[in-house]
Regions:
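Conserved small/polar residues in nucleotide/adenosyl-binding loops
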Residues: 164-170
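Compact, glycine/acidic-enriched structural inserts
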Residues: 147-162
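Regulatory sensory and allosteric helical modules in signal-transduction proteins
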Residues: 62-70, 77-102
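A short, hydrophobic, proline-anchored segment that marks a local hinge/packing element in signaling
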Residues: 110-119, 128
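Glycine-rich acetyl-CoA-binding "A-motif" of GNAT/NAT acetyltransferases
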Residues: 123
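A short, polar/charged loop-to-alpha-helix boundary motif
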Residues: 75-84, 134-143
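Short, Lys/Arg- and Gly-enriched loop/turn segments at beta-strand edges
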Residues: 101-108, 137
Length: 174
């Protein structure tokens, strides 16, 4: 069953015409937000795959899940189909399951974090990032076994879960 979005405000968004200059300013602000996502991840990453090989991909998507800025396409649709809980303000989602996001991540070493963005109780966008973790408990160091017969030999397979709710850690996963 697909995810259910919980909004505390049901007021419709107002449509507004935007001139080309304002649109260009908004576009560049969104691209800058994505570059800032890059900078934060590079400064804080513990994984050499992210820190040294730049194997990570931040993305901002609109409320339908279509990529607005990024470089790898959107995986929101697949994630929402695989996650059977609610999406609420303050949630942060995590998955390492390539089958749970239409293959946007290619193996268990890629960890996907997804944050729905709300304004005044309404979902307006998604911010997401996935990056390559060096070792996630697979049968060989580095968790990239060339002779794996099933996905569980790569390491810990985390289905789509809500890691935080209202910015507090979700007890079963901590």
């Amino acid at each position: 069953m697909p995810a259910t979005i919980v909004e505390t405000n049901t007021k419709k968004f107002k449509r507004k015409d935007i001139d080309p200059i304002t649109l260009d300013i908004i576009e560049n602000a969104m691209m800058n937000a994505r570059y800032e996502m890059d900078a934060v991840v590079f400064r804080t990453a513990m994984s050499p795959g992210i820190r040294e090989q730049n194997d990570m991909f931040p993305m901002i998507a609109n409320l339908e899940g279509k990529m607005v800025v990024g470089q790898f396409g959107s995986f929101i649709h697949g994630f929402k189909e695989a996650y059977d809980g609610t999406i609420e303000e303050g949630d942060l989602f995590l998955t390492t399951d390539p089958y749970a996001c239409n293959g946007a991540i290619s193996h268990i070493n890629d960890w996907l974090l997804l944050r729905p963005i709300f304004k005044d109780g309404r979902l307006i966008a998604y911010a997401a990032m996935f990056g390559h973790m060096t070792d996630v408990g697979g049968k060989v160091p580095g968790s990239l076994p060339t002779d794996a017969r099933e996905i569980f030999e790569e390491g810990i397979r985390v289905p789509p879960v809500s890691y935080t709710h209202l910015t507090l850690p979700t007890t079963p996963y901590v």
